[in-house]
């Protein structure tokens, strides 16, 4: 079976840059697929960002979805009666990991957008997954701020979640987040999503928020508490410049 390269595009800046680097490095030698797992609760602007990236990458994006749950975290919560906890988040497992497993082939070489500051997470991922996988960003010492800058410098407007000063382009109200500052920001930016998660977590008895050593329900969170990080710093360092030159020379 012929090997192919599968770049996992998540509508985040890191996965976009990792995919761009992988395409340049491959230079058409092996079949290459850019795959995206659809999650309904991500920001609608992701469709615009994906279309912009598709033109930048020069490769069509293959959209994948878990039809059983229509790609929705809330349908996962409803059917699984579980949001998150010691066993992780079922939405990640069912809407992303399971979809990836169904799509992948034994001979695939996978490309992921782990950044240089995520070396520990990358090592854990490799330990937990018996697959042929590479991280172009770690190989080049590229951090998340470098990726934000490279996307911006390519002329593509960053996804709305970044422009709203979120650290990553996750769902509007990520169930894996436990910080009061994060959820109070979601309360302001996406009140409907805050209320929906508050209702669902109360229904399932899940205390999402962590304050000190205590857990509290989302609907018990006092407005204004917590401190979420300000706007991400967007600047291109030396490794970023080296990677940009690599792309320009490709």
Report residues per predicted region.
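Nucleotide-activated chemistry modules centered on ATP-dependent adenylation/adenylyltransferase
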Residues: 1-250
């Amino acid at each position: 079976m012929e090997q192919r390269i599968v770049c996992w595009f998540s509508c985040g800046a890191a996965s976009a840059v990792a995919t761009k680097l992988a395409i340049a490095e491959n230079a058409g030698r092996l079949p290459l697929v850019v795959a995206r797992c659809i999650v309904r609760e991500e920001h609608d602007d992701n469709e615009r960002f994906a279309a912009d990236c598709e033109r930048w990458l020069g490769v069509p994006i293959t959209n994948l979805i878990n039809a059983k749950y229509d790609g929705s975290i809330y349908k996962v919560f409803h059917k699984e009666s579980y949001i998150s906890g010691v066993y992780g988040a079922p939405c990640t497992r069912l809407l992303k990991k399971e979809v990836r497993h169904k799509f992948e082939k034994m001979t695939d070489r996978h490309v992921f957008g782990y950044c240089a500051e995520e070396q520990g997470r990358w090592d854990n991922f490799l330990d937990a997954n018996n697959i042929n996988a590479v991280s172009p960003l770690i190989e080049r010492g590229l951090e998340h701020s470098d990726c934000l800058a490279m996307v911006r410098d390519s002329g593509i407007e960053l996804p709305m979640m970044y422009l709203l000063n979120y650290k990553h382009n996750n769902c509007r109200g990520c169930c894996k987040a436990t910080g009061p500052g994060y959820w109070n920001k979601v309360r302001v930016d996406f009140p409907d999503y805050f209320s929906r998660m508050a209702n669902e977590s109360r229904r399932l008895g899940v205390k999402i928020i962590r304050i000190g050593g205590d857990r509290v329900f989302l609907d018990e969170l006092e407005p204004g508490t917590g401190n979420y990080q300000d706007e991400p710093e967007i600047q291109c360092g030396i490794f970023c410049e080296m990677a940009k030159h690599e792309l320009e020379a490709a």
